[in-house]
């Protein structure tokens, strides 16, 4: 199945029927042993991607399972649900952006979600590059080895996001981050990318509404909300514009009134001098 046809299939299924299918997969996973659970989730993903992309995803899953024995890449209790909980959850981000996207940055890539999954799909696009930023050297080593094994078009940047973002932002079309930070902090981290014109694609769990409310206290946002196919309570925030809100007069002085003119408000002595 080619990229265009898989995109159409996802569009035909989303959002309600895909959510039902993913929920059913999740319930089956909880009752099955590890091998059958992984196969069940894999079958659901296989309907949405090409054979070549599926082969790359298989390699990613194999590498993660092997490295997970020595490095905590994902929560251990989510490993039996790998294809649904992590791969499908990451895959859905690709369908929310234009098919012309070639340059994608994933921050705090950790166990490779969504970055490695995005790269597995974008590998079918000539000239595509996915930049994975991960400061943990062991996790960066995993990302590098998984990318090599699956022949992914990635660049691994083993640096802190704060150090790398200004240098990497130019030319990026999409920036993503999964389970990295609450939205207000996430906007701070991704600001260079958003200001450079990148689309921010951020999956959020059941607290998405509270995070969005908190973020809007300090930011003016243009965004679209999409239901998650992997989490019935979650949403994916697709942010097209983010600007810091102008501080109020009170906030400029830390919430205290200005000291200008304070002397004139004090009582004066008979000689007109302030005590």
Curated annotation (Swiss-Prot):
Sites where the protein binds S-adenosyl-L-methionine: 108, 113, 161-162, 178
Enzyme class: transferase
Alphabetized InterPro entries for the sequence: rRNA_ssu_MeTfrase_G, SAM-dependent_MTases_sf
Biased composition annotated in UniProt, kind: Polar residues: 250-261
Any GO MF annotation of the entry: rRNA (guanine-N7-)-methyltransferase activity
Region (Disordered): 247-275
Compartment(s) of residence: Cytoplasm
Domain of life where this protein originates: Bacteria
Keyword Nucleus: no
Entry's Gene Ontology cellular component terms: cytosol
Keyword terms of this UniProt record: Cytoplasm, Methyltransferase, rRNA processing, S-adenosyl-L-methionine, Transferase
NCBIfam families from the UniProt entry: rsmG_gidB (TIGR00138)
Family: Belongs to the methyltransferase superfamily. RNA methyltransferase RsmG family.
Protein name (record): Ribosomal RNA small subunit methyltransferase G
Protein's organism: Azorhizobium caulinodans (strain ATCC 43989 / DSM 5975 / JCM 20966 / LMG 6465 / NBRC 14845 / NCIMB 13405 / ORS 571)
Gene this protein is translated from: rsmG
